[in-house]
Structures are given as structure tokens and as C-alpha cells.
């Protein structure tokens, strides 16, 4: 009788390890970009919530000019729980049409975080929004929201 040896050869195991390494090299950067995009969308949602708070404050106090973060009951870094990834800045703008008070919210990624270099997210009083892809576009300054701009970067 012939006795057959069962099992895998070293070459077969090396091929499997190589395939797993290639898949991991492709999947990990994709996963990181997915997480980055998810955090950006969370911040966009948070900006919309902050915009509602600003509007509530404006209705109650008839102005936004001079309001502080504590007056508006908003934090300066988000997310509030966990590691902050963005700083939020409310910029009141005066002397617009009919002397109406207007504002712009800008979320800027904090350096040395997972969102670092992801670009500014901007929302204004009209609900117009934009996102600057990366830090090198517009010389590192935020985009200007318009009726044709969007958060998807297109």
C-alpha cells in the first residue's frame, strides 16, 4: 500500500500569504478613506444642526453679531465626545442686502488627526454649502458657498 501525505506545501502557504497581503494592501487605504468620508458627513450634519441653533438665537435675540459660542450653546471642537477632529468657526457678516445680518460656518480639520488635510466644510445663512478638497486648493483657504456648490466636491 502507498501512504499519501496530506497537507499543504510551503509554496502553497506562501501563495496564500501573498494573496492576503495584496488584498490587505488594497483594502486598508480604502477603509481609511471610507472612515474619513464618514467623519466628514458627520461634521456636515453637525454644521446643519449648528445652523439651526444660530437661527434660533437670531430669532430670539434679533441678531447674531457679537454672539459667542457659549451664547449660541455650541462647542468650538467636534465631535464633542472622543477625539476632536474639526474646529468650528462662526463668522457673522454685516452690511449685506437690506442690512440683514448674515453668517458663515466653517469647519476646519484639526492638524495631526485622521481628518487632517481633508479640507474645509462651509455652510452659510442661506443653506449654501461647499467643501474644499484637500488643503492645497484655494491656497489653503475655505471655498465660497454658492447656489451651485455642494458638499460632495463636484
Spans of features found by a protein language model:
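N-terminal single-pass transmembrane signal-anchor helix
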Residues: 1-34
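Membrane-proximal amphipathic alpha-helices
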Residues: 32, 36-47
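Alpha-helix exit/C-cap motif
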Residues: 37-41, 52-71
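Extracellular/periplasmic head regions of type IV pilus-like filament subunits
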Residues: 63-128
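Low-complexity, S/T/G/P-rich flexible repeat/linker segments used as non-globular hinges
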Residues: 120-154
Amino acid at each position: 500500500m502507498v501512504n499519501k501525505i496530506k497537507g499543504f506545501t510551503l509554496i502553497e502557504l506562501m501563495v496564500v500569504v501573498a494573496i492576503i497581503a495584496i488584498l490587505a494592501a488594497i483594502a486598508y487605504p480604502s477603509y481609511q478613506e471610507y472612515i474619513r468620508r464618514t467623519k466628514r458627513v458627520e461634521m456636515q450634519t453637525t454644521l446643519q444642526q449648528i445652523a439651526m441653533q444660530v437661527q434660533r438665537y437670531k430669532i430670539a435675540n434679533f441678531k447674531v453679531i457679537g454672539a459667542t459660542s457659549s451664547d449660541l450653546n455650541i462647542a468650538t471642537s467636534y465631535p464633542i465626545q472622543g477625539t476632536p477632529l474639526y474646529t468650528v468657526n462662526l463668522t457673522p457678516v454685516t452690511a449685506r442686502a437690506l442690512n440683514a445680518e448674515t453668517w458663515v460656518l466653517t469647519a476646519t480639520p484639526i492638524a495631526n488627526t485622521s481628518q487632517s488635510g481633508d479640507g474645509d466644510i462651509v455652510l452659510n445663512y442661506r443653506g449654501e454649502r461647499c467643501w474644499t478638497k484637500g488643503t492645497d486648493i484655494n491656497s489653503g483657504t475655505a471655498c465660497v458657498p454658492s447656489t451651485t456648490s455642494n458638499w460632495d466636491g463636484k
